[in-house]
Amino acid sequence: MASPVTSAAMADLLDPRFREITQNEFTAMPDKIPMLYGQETSDRPEERYSDVTPMGDIPEFTGTLAYDGPDLGYDVTVTHKEFAGGIQIERKLYDDDQTGSVVEGMFAELGRSAAKTRQKDAARIFNQSFSVDTKFYNHTEGVALCSNSHTTTRSGVSTASGFDNLGTAALSPTSLAAAITSFRLLRDLAGEPIDEVPDELWVPVNLHLQARELIETIVGLEEASETMNLLDGSMVIHEWARITDTNDWWV
């Protein structure tokens, strides 16, 4: 809408014939940020993080000591961005608002808009996970979060297996089981298995019923038999309306 907000544009607010004019009565969407991100204060324009790789195996001693040491890993630069917005309201509209609350509520809408903006940006971890997203983070590895091209800074480490975290299969019992296995077999920068067990399944709202069927069915999943569903209760399901793709899913 044009700014400033004028009495001509909001004529209904000045008309005493209206008994009620509603304003954003929908329940606010849940805040997913604490589930996905750590939150810290900062006094710098950007924050930089790095790590060092694990070391390799200890060889059998044959009379000469073998030396090893870690390598420097990848750097991540977090750039803080400033957001600002305002609302201009015509004095006549403010003075003559017959509802007594709608104009005042417009100021609260700024806060709700800020909250929505934060949630949309937080959802980039999913919506931009298949491309190199540098809006807030710059990673020296230079590949997408979900990629079959992940590398390591440690020389001599094969990335042929355990570095690919990109899948393309539609959500199903078979693909979810395969994703869990692949997750557990992911390797660190030294090429050693991490063996972390995924316990969350993130889906768009389009897949939330299918996700519940996969995780909450006790027996007979996609079968006429009474076979136990080994995925039952294995994960917490998070469905989020901010995830824009209708078919993608993440563990």
Where in this protein do the model-derived segments appear?
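Solvent-exposed, flexible loop/coil residues
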Residues: 53, 65, 93, 97-98, ...
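Generic detector of short, locally flexible boundary/turn motifs and exposed helical patches
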Residues: 10-12, 49-55, 75-77, 161-169
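Long, contiguous amphipathic alpha-helices that act as assembly "spine/axial" helices in icosahedral shell
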Residues: 74-133, 201
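Assembly/oligomerization interface modules of large self-assembling protein complexes
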Residues: 23-83
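N-terminal alpha-helical "arm" segments
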Residues: 1-27
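Sequence/fold signature of self-assembling virion shell proteins
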Residues: 2-5, 142-251
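Charged, low-complexity, helix-prone segments enriched in Lys/Glu/Asp/Gln
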Residues: 19-21, 26, 40-41, 110, ...
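Signature of extracytoplasmic/envelope-associated structural regions
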Residues: 43, 54-59, 77, 109-138, ...
